[in-house]
UniProtKB/Swiss-Prot annotation:
GO terms for molecular function: rRNA binding; structural constituent of ribosome. Keywords: Ribonucleoprotein, Ribosomal protein, RNA-binding, rRNA-binding. GO terms for cellular component: cytosolic small ribosomal subunit. HAMAP family: Ribosomal_uS15_B (MF_01343_B). Pfam families: Ribosomal_S15. It comes from Desulforamulus reducens (strain ATCC BAA-1160 / DSM 100696 / MI-1). This is Small ribosomal subunit protein uS15. The keyword ATP-binding does not apply. Gene3D superfamilies: 6.10.250.3130, S15/NS1, RNA-binding.
């Protein structure tokens, strides 16, 4: 379940830290969050899709690692991204 190019560009525009930014932790976290949300909706309809469930767990772990990295490096940016995405913490 890939993101459409339009949706991906929209997320990058909203979370970039500088011009041409596609790889900052904020952008990566936002893209993963959108993919996680899409896959969660898919799994609500297809409960036995265990292959996709494993991919979801990998994405959640990757997002968690990026959030931990951001928390350790710059706590203000960490709090900002949590608020913008509405993630618990």
């Amino acid at each position: 379940m890939a993101l459409s190019p339009e949706k991906k560009n929209e997320i990058i525009e909203n979370f970039k830290t500088h011009e041409g930014d596609t790889g900052s932790p904020e952008v990566q976290i936002a893209l993963l969050t959108e993919r996680i949300n899409q896959l969660t909706m898919h799994l609500k309809s297809f409960k036995k899709d265990h292959h996709s469930r494993r991919g979801l767990l990998k994405m959640v772990g990757q997002r968690r690692a990026l959030l931990n990295y951001l928390r350790d490096r710059n706590f203000d940016r960490y709090r900002t991204i949590l608020e913008k995405l509405g993630l618990r913490k």
